[in-house]
């Protein structure tokens, strides 16, 4: 008999995370690497674990993630959203709690495109009056 597993997809900036929750003892594997190896800084680790801490499900599921694109912050945000969506499938009763804390909301902020005639998206060349 196959194990029960719950899927969730999260996106943030350019990062896309596919998250799988399997009943277990709380191990987190990201791109076949341990959680601590993948996110050496504490801030990213806290971001990823927030939905689990809020719902008190830290030791109930093993989390297996595939994440690509973006940088460290974007990947952490994408995994957070993926975990929240997968937890919602596992237990629909926690929807109000996750929604109130903002874990089910996709952050729409993206990098603004560079415009021609400018150095960056908004940085203009130095202006000389004379």
Curated annotation (Swiss-Prot):
Q: Where along the sequence do coiled-coil regions lie?
A: none
Q: Report the domain of life of the source organism.
A: Bacteria
The record's keywords, sorted A to Z, are:
Ribonucleoprotein, Ribosomal protein
Q: Where is this region: Disordered?
A: 105-130
Cellular component (GO) terms are: cytosolic small ribosomal subunit
What are its GO biological-process terms? Answer: translation
Q: Name one GO molecular function term.
A: RNA binding
Report the PROSITE patterns cross-referenced here. Answer: RIBOSOMAL_S9 (PS00360)
Instruction: Spell out the Gene3D superfamilies in the cross-references.
Output: 3.30.230.10
Q: Name one Pfam family in it.
A: Ribosomal_S9
Record field: compositional bias (Basic residues)? 111-130
TM region(s), chain numbering = none
Q: Family, per the entry?
A: Belongs to the universal ribosomal protein uS9 family.
According to UniProt, the name of this protein is Small ribosomal subunit protein uS9
**Organism in which the protein naturally occurs:** Syntrophomonas wolfei subsp. wolfei (strain DSM 2245B / Goettingen)
């Amino acid at each position: 008999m196959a194990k029960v597993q719950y899927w969730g997809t999260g996106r943030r900036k350019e990062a896309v995370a596919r998250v799988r929750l399997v009943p277990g003892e709380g191990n987190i594997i990201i791109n076949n690497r341990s959680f601590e190896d993948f996110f050496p800084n504490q801030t990213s680790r806290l971001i990823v674990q927030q939905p689990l801490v809020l719902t008190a499900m830290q030791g109930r599921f093993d989390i297996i993630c595939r994440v690509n694109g973006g940088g460290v912050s974007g990947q952490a945000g994408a995994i957070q959203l993926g975990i929240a969506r997968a937890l919602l499938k596992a237990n629909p009763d926690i929807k109000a709690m996750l929604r109130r804390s903002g874990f089910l909301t996709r952050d729409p902020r993206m990098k603004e495109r560079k415009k021609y005639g400018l150095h960056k998206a908004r940085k203009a060349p130095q202006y000389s009056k004379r």
